[in-house]
Amino acid sequence: VVQNPETSSPGLAFLLATISHFGSEWVNFWKILNQNNVSVTSDWESSYYGNFIAGGGGNSIVVSYASSPIAELIYSDPPVEIPPTAIIEDSCFKQVEYAGILKNTKNKPEAEALIDFLLSQRFQEDIPLNMFMMPVLTEASLPVAFSIYPIIPSDLNLISPNEIESNRNNWTEIWTETVLR
């Protein structure tokens, strides 16, 4: 199960990973997936908790976050010793989420206070178990589960932000033509 890159950030990250990994052959990868009846959903939640076999669906592979194995270990009911998900390292793309202050905001002091709070060690140490993302502060302590299943693959697929900005619309249009039509 994959997510539509136009409506889902994990879907976009996976599309970008395939572009980085396969280069000019990325469209062929998607053609093959499509010929094998890949399921496409609009969002992560419906793919993971709906279509994926661990969520009761019929698909045995799902695009998800590198932190999914940790979340499964912590929240599965009934508990599991081995998560139903794994990381395929050469399929990973680094997804970064940002917070910023708008240039002409009328609430600059409040916006600065929010950014300061988001960057505080206390908040950063709450991120892993609440959002299953890595904190931005390197000095933030990680929960034990994050040492059992480390979530930072050693070989990430990367594309520069400028290249993404220049090509994103074209890439998603090609993807839509290849997979959805």
Regions found by a protein language model. Name each.
Residues 6-10, 67-70, 92, 106:
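Solvent-exposed loop/turn segments at secondary-structure junctions
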Residues 7-8, 20-26, 105-111:
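Short helix-loop capping/hinge motifs at secondary-structure junctions, enriched
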Residues 144-181:
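Extracellular/periplasmic bilobal clamshell ligand-binding domains
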Residues 93, 99-158:
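Mature extracytoplasmic/periplasmic domains
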Residues 19-23, 35-38, 53-58, 67, ...:
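Sec-exported extracytoplasmic/periplasmic mature domains
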Residues 16, 31, 46, 50, ...:
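Solvent-exposed, polar/charged alpha-helical surfaces in well-ordered, non-transmembrane soluble domains
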Residues 17-91:
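Ligand-binding pocket segment of bilobal, Venus flytrap-like solute-binding proteins
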Residues 1-20:
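Short loop->beta-strand "edge-of-pocket" segments that line small-molecule binding or catalytic clefts
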